[in-house]
Amino acid sequence: MTDCHAQLLPIYFREPSVNLGLGSQRGKLPHLTGMALLKDARLYADSPEAYAFTSLDFERAAKRYGKVGGFAHLATLVKRMKASRPGALPLDGGDTWQGSATALWTRGQDMVDAAKLLGVNLMTGHWEFTLGAERVQEVVEKDFKPAGIEFLAQNVRTTDFNDEVFKPWVMRTLN
């Protein structure tokens, strides 16, 4: 999972209408939007997939299909995944601890607690670092380590000696 932006409840989510790819990536997935995305992915307009992945006819589609996401739905998916794939490791790709009023008020703690309840095994940060290095370290030490959640980041280093702050990768043997 990734990029829930601290939204615990379902929301009306609108994909961007522009996503510029640079150089050789211009005009290719994942930098396609709208009809170009639907055509490339072989999806139909006026479908649940069009609503989920494009901004086309957003207001009408939102009225038709409703809100998306939320941690209750995500928890159901994680539960199904773990049941059908024993040993699966839910990975949080970041952008989880920020983006809502409650996350702002709690410095991301509401989302940290939600990730622990969800059963996340591994996480890497993204905009979590806007909370500051001390806060990220605090969550890793006081919340994640006791819960058995590993925090990974390959591009976070100390300023003094350029040492890694977090493990850059992990390997697990499953089943």
Regions found by a protein language model. Give the residues of each.
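Acidic, metal/ion-coordinating pockets
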Residues: 1-175
